[in-house]
Swiss-Prot record:
Organism of derivation: Mycoplasma genitalium (strain ATCC 33530 / DSM 19775 / NCTC 10195 / G37) (Mycoplasmoides genitalium)
Pathways per UniProt: Metabolic intermediate biosynthesis; acetyl-CoA biosynthesis; acetyl-CoA from acetate: step 2/2
Sorted UniProt keywords: Acyltransferase, Cytoplasm, Transferase
Annotated GO MF terms: phosphate acetyltransferase activity
Gene3D superfamilies with a match to the protein in the record: 3.40.50.10950, Isocitrate/Isopropylmalate dehydrogenase-like
Protein name stated in the entry: Phosphate acetyltransferase
Stored InterPro entries: P_Ac_Bu_trans (IPR012147), P_AcTrfase (IPR004614), P_AcTrfase_dom1 (IPR042113), P_AcTrfase_dom2 (IPR042112), Phos_Acetyltrans/Butyryltrans (IPR050500), PTA_PTB (IPR002505)
Subcellular location: Cytoplasm
Record field: catalytic activity: acetyl-CoA + phosphate = acetyl phosphate + CoA
Gene name for this UniProt entry: pta
Entry's EC annotation: 2.3.1.8
Source organism superkingdom: Bacteria
Length: 320
């Protein structure tokens, strides 16, 4: 069963469907996905428009929608100001903040008016995630994961979209975020590899040391996982049993790793795209982990189907 089917089943089982807001109401692709999500009855989509002229004639007005030019944004601006004044934001800046659709969406999530947000078809990643980080950060390190699927195979690649140069502690937290996410999907057996250009001491260098320490920090927190987590490993040793027996005979895994923790964004981002384009894997994500409520970023090349799927994922994340 694909991860999208798992999430659909979870959403079918809850009586109160999560409300997920899509702030890019001027995007035809977003509106088509919203229409499909509304028809699915799995979530309650909501949309933000700048003005009434943006609303297409065929838009279903029964779908919850916000028109910024017609809203009294005072209470939202006051909320943002109180949240951000310690960082130097003044009231005028807060008023400007909530007039931006992505920022208003994050505000509605923070106020629990809605349960989650999907954005990024028109916005750059930084403009989707910055408001979310400003209002929904928990103090924990925020990271992301791609679910890579091919047939019945499911792998988790992290972090391929968010953390540029994580240090050892951040890398351990990235691993923990993804481990917890995979467990939430009821993965029967988790094998996690902290990846490097070295396998268990075959190479030396600062980057190797970082990965070794990250593995150590993770296992200090989860000593029960010593048989399931290993680092530092090269990808071929983590993925191919024959190579693993040669390079790391002391590692007694019966199955290959299904969580791959990359040492930096360069490695992770390149790897997931190679797996997608050359390996034929479906890349589902990036799924943002570590916020108080779910906010997920679309690729600007996202199809209607991609937007639909991210809406399903975000709604499933919102289920408490």
């Amino acid at each position: 069963m694909s991860v999208i089917d798992i999430f659909k089943k979870r959403l079918q089982a809850v009586s109160k469907k999560p409300v997920i807001i899509f702030p890019e109401g001027w995007s035809a692709s977003v509106l088509k996905a919203v229409e499909m999500l509304n028809e699915s009855k799995l979530i309650q989509p909501a949309v933000i428009f700048h003005n009434r002229q943006e609303i297409p004639a065929n838009f279903d007005k029964k779908i919850t929608h916000y028109v910024i030019d017609e809203m009294d944004l005072t209470s939202y601006a006051n909320f943002v100001y109180e949240k951000r004044k310690h960082k130097g934001m003044d009231l005028k800046e807060a008023q400007k903040f909530v007039r931006d659709p992505s920022s208003l969406a994050a505000t509605l999530v923070a106020l629990k008016v809605v349960d989650g947000e999907v954005c990024g078809k028109e916005y750059a990643t930084k403009d989707t995630l910055r408001p979310a980080l400003q209002l929904l950060a928990t103090g924990n390190f925020v990271s992301s994961v791609f679910i890579m699927e091919k047939g019945e195979e499911r792998l988790y690649f992290t972090d391929c979209a968010f953390a540029v140069y994580p240090n050892s502690q951040e890398l351990a937290t990235i691993a923990e975020n993804t481990f917890n996410f995979a467990k939430s999907l009821n993965e029967d057996e988790i094998k996690m590899a902290f990846l490097s250009y070295s396998t268990l001491g075959s190479g030396k260098g600062e980057m190797v040391d970082k990965v070794v320490l990250a593995t150590k920090l993770f296992l200090e927190k989860h000593p029960e996982l010593h048989q399931s987590v290993c680092g530092e490993l090269q990808f071929d040793a983590a993925f191919v049993e024959k190579v693993r027996l040669q390079k790391a005979p002391q590692l007694t895994w019966k199955n290959s790793a299904n969580i791959y923790v990359f040492p930096n964004l360069d490695a992770g981002n390149i790897a997931y795209k190679i797996a997608q384009r050359l390996g034929g894997y479906d890349a589902i994500g990036p799924i943002v982990l570590g916020l108080s409520s779910p906010v997920n970023d679309l690729s600007r090349g996202a199809s209607v189907s991609d937007i639909f799927n991210v809406g399903i994922i975000t709604a499933a994340q919102a289920i408490k």
